[in-house]
Swiss-Prot record:
S-adenosyl 3-(methylsulfanyl)propylamine binds at Q44, Q75, D99, D119, D150, G151, D168. Belongs to the spermidine/spermine synthase family. Coiled coil: none annotated. CDD domains: AdoMet_MTases (cd02440). PROSITE patterns: PABS_1, PABS_2. Pathway: Amine and polyamine biosynthesis; spermidine biosynthesis; spermidine from putrescine: step 1/1. The keyword Cell cycle does not apply. GO terms for molecular function: spermidine synthase activity. The active site is at D168. GO terms for cellular component: cytosol; nucleus. The lineage of its organism: Eukaryota, Fungi, Dikarya, Ascomycota, Taphrinomycotina. This is Spermidine synthase. InterPro entries: PABS, PABS_CS, SAM-dependent_MTases_sf, Spermi_synthase, Spermi_synthase_euk, Spermidine_synt_N, Spermidine_synt_N_sf. Disulfide bonds: none annotated.
């Protein structure tokens, strides 16, 4: 099926343009080889296309969520920064992450006994299973359970249950807005066991320092141990995205993994993450460090 036969308003002259108010004055463009899916779920616009250079691309409400070429740098970091900051994570919850990529990373940890994913949009899961098989492979693992529903409401039913909770959300200008505010972080804390760890998607230091500061301030009112890390990823705005990493254990250094794979295991399991980059991801440029330090100091 050609671009002309199945298209989308953001694709013009064979190019996808990521124009969004969250990053005004700039846009990522990718050359489109073939539109694979274009539709609207109950919650958002869903687009999948085959690009010339980045493989299959998942786009929600006009914003790139994942591409086959670079998705691993995000999925690995948001998962392993949290999981390797916990001494023995057995029960893990993923909020969002309907493409399955974070689940794929979670089940690489043999100590994990159960991984639950809660995503509000079943269509994203269905589309990902069809068009993003390498990412959605996580859904096939026997340790995985899937719940379709609102993550905020899901958490209200759980107390002292999970060792690690990973929030793989879209940007805070749509259905994920509530996942960037203090009441949500309180629910996360309540749902964690002692020593529990969270990671959450926390935007880009180059264009969202105000958002990052507000999120860190909110998390710090709930968790005693809060840090900010980042990864590089070409198809996200300005080429990087950050994570809030927080623990209920005030004594641990989140920049130093409590558990490590051997170098051989790391090379086999991961394309981006390793124990050295775990530590390095918390080292911030001065302009960002100053904002982060101010938001997390108490």
């Amino acid at each position: 099926m050609s671009v002309q036969e199945l298209s989308h308003p953001l694709i013009k002259d064979g190019w996808f343009r990521e124009i969004n108010n969250m990053w005004p004055g700039q846009a990522m463009t990718l050359k489109v080889k073939k539109v694979l899916y274009a539709g609207k779920s109950k919650y958002q616009d869903v687009l999948v296309f085959e690009s010339e250079t980045y493989g299959h691309v998942l786009v929600l409400d006009g914003a790139i969520q994942a591409t086959e070429r670079d998705e691993f740098s995000y999925q690995e970091m948001i998962a392993h920064l949290a999981l390797n900051s916990h001494p023995n994570p057995k029960k893990v919850l993923v909020i969002g992450g309907g493409d399955g990529g974070v689940l794929r990373e979670v089940v690489k940890h043999e100590c994990v006994e159960e991984a639950i994913l809660c995503d509000i949009d079943e269509d994203v899961i269905k589309v990902s299973k069809q068009y993003l098989p390498e990412m959605s492979a996580g859904f096939n693992h026997p340790k995985v359970k899937v719940h379709i529903g609102d993550g905020f409401k899901f958490l209200q039913d759980y107390q002292n249950t999970f060792d690690v909770i990973i929030t793989d959300s879209s940007d805070p200008d749509g259905p994920a807005e509530a996942l960037f505010q203090k009441p949500y972080f309180q629910l996360l804390s309540d749902a964690l066991r002692g020593g529990g760890v969270i990671t959450t998607q926390a935007e880009c230091m180059w264009i969202h320092l105000g958002v990052i500061s507000n999120v860190l301030t909110a998390v710090k009112t709930v968790f005693p141990n809060v840090r900010y890390a980042y990864t590089t990823i070409p198809t996200y705005p300005s080429g990087s995205i950050g994570f809030v990493v927080a623990s209920k254990d005030a004594s641990i250094d989140l920049s130093k993994p409590l558990r490590k794979w051997s170098p051989e295991e790391e090379n086999k399991l991961c394309k981006y993450y390793n124990s050295e980059i775990h530590a390095a991801s918390f080292v911030l440029p001065t302009f960002a460090r100053d904002v982060v330090d101010k938001a997390t100091s108490s």
